[in-house]
Amino acid sequence: MIQVIVLSGPIGAGKSSLTSILAEHLGTQAFYEGVDSNPVLPLYYKDMKRYTFLLNTYLLNHRLAQINQAIQEKNSVSDRSIYEDALFFKMNADSSVADPTEFKIYNDLLENMMEDTPGNPSKKPDLLIYIHVSLDTMLKRIKKRGRSFEQISTDPSLKDYYARLLKYYEPWYENYNASPKIMINGDKLDFVTNMNAQKEVLKEIDEKLREIGNL
């Protein structure tokens, strides 16, 4: 049975941590975003207006390559969904940080690349797991992992950016319909440091996988 699971959620939600936990639990291959090897991301944080389109096209290419590899592996867990990159782009377009025409071009490109074609396996996941966190939890985890370009101590304006981002996530999750989905409460269930919370999260995911016939 092919089982492709993707994680989603804002910066600092714990996607990579849950990817590792879930991949070990299910005995599947884990795929990671590779933030530290992304040459565009630090540039984006310095000048979002200039680098939004470049960052999103870079990520689109990277994620499509990951999806193709994940399909070949048959069973996999990825720490970021290709669908939520458009959320960042839309937020920047709405706030005039990005050009609306660039956003439309990107969105059309994404839809064309994700379209199912005869004879090719579907690029859609079997399950999307969304980790909901509050701004407070988000900021604590961003500070803890210590990536310099993400810190509000370096750039205080990032706090407003993160707060705006959270406002886009809930509607995005509610409207997501490319696959079955489940929401994990990342505030209530600290699966990174609390083993009981981790067991509860894995139980919820296992139940969802059984419900959709993938376990």
Swiss-Prot record:
Its EC number is 2.7.1.76. GO terms for molecular function: ATP binding; deoxyadenosine kinase activity. It is an enzyme of class 2 (transferase). The keyword Nucleotide-binding applies. Substrate binds at residues 33, 45, 56, 80, 85, 150. The active site is at residue 79. ATP binds at residues 9-17. GO terms for cellular component: cytoplasm. Keywords: ATP-binding, Kinase, Nucleotide-binding, Transferase. It catalyses: 2'-deoxyadenosine + ATP = dAMP + ADP + H(+). SUPFAM superfamilies: P-loop containing nucleoside triphosphate hydrolases. Heterodimer of a deoxyadenosine (DAK) and a deoxyguanosine kinase (DGK). Belongs to the DCK/DGK family. DGK/DAK plays an essential role in generating the deoxyribonucleotide precursors, dGTP and dATP, for DNA metabolism. This is Deoxyadenosine kinase. It comes from Lactobacillus acidophilus (strain ATCC 700396 / NCK56 / N2 / NCFM).
